[in-house]
From Swiss-Prot:
Motif Prevents secretion from ER: chain residues: 220-223
Biological processes, Gene Ontology terms: protein folding
Signal peptide annotation: 1-17
Compartmental location: Endoplasmic reticulum lumen
Key words of the record: Coiled coil, Endoplasmic reticulum, Selenocysteine, Signal
GO (cellular component) term, any one: endoplasmic reticulum lumen
Pfam family for this entry, one: Thioredoxin
Spans annotated as Disordered: 201-223
Family of this protein: Belongs to the protein disulfide isomerase family.
Protein name (Swiss-Prot/TrEMBL): Protein disulfide-isomerase-like protein EhSep2
Species assigned in the record: Emiliania huxleyi
Length: 223
């Protein structure tokens, strides 16, 4: 198992000059089963923002290269990583997600994207989270909730999980629909504004030309 992990790491590292490149072939091994937290940038090589961010992201990867707690990685959504981008709902580039064990769903990173901000987040927020095997990482409130969920019937626990996931998915869908509606309204308003500018500009120019300039104080009319 250790040899397999080392092989996967070497192969992945060779595919990227900085961060390790993830694909469906190594994602489970390096992220979900590694016990590490993962900080992952989903990208497209042609994306301007991705190119701009690459030096800082690669520097971040170098900083955590030997870390036993945090993995810094890339997923190329245009090649072998495309199935992962689809699985985790990536719709724009770059999208940054983080996985704190035992979380397998991933969370969207919404912080700043400078090297200092990324490094601070990785140092302070990433690491193994609260779980049955890591009770020392749990707050008293988390321990109470965890016990409640452990004592719950498996069917009830599954039902509760699916309900929460559906509520979240429905909320995201509603948000996206509203966003599309707002974008359409914005475009319609912008089109009207541009048309008005186009129609008004020549009239305004002629009206200004037809309006005599104000006389300077003390000036006399020429005879």
């Amino acid at each position: 198992m250790a040899l397999r992990s080392l092989t996967l790491l070497c192969a992945a590292a060779g595919a990227s000059a900085g961060a390790i490149e993830l694909t469906p072939d190594n994602f489970d091994e390096l992220v979900l089963k590694s016990g590490k937290a993962a900080f992952i940038k989903f990208l497209a090589p042609w994306u301007g923002h991705c190119k701009k961010m690459k030096p800082d992201w690669d520097s971040l990867a170098s900083t955590f290269e030997d870390s036993k707690k945090v993995l810094i990685a890339d997923v190329d959504c245009t090649t072998g990583g495309k199935p992962l981008c689809e699985k985790y709902g990536v719709r724009g580039y770059p999208t940054i997600k983080y996985f704190n064990p035992p979380d397998e769903e991933g969370e969207d990173y919404k912080g700043g994207r400078s090297l200092d901000e990324l490094k601070k987040f990785a140092e302070n927020e990433l690491g193994p989270g609260c779980s049955v095997d890591l009770m020392d990482n749990c707050s008293e409130e988390q321990k109470g909730k965890l016990k409640e969920y452990i004592d719950m019937a498996p069917e009830k626990r599954t039902e509760m999980l699916e309900t929460l996931k559906k509520e979240l998915a429905d909320a995201e869908s509603t948000h996206e629909a509203l966003l599309k509606e707002l974008q359409a309204t914005y475009k319609e308003s912008m089109d009207k504004l541009e048309k008005l500018k186009e129609e008004s500009a020549p009239k305004i120019k002629l009206l200004k030309a037809a309006t005599p300039a104000p006389k300077a104080e003390g000036a006399k009319d020429e005879v």
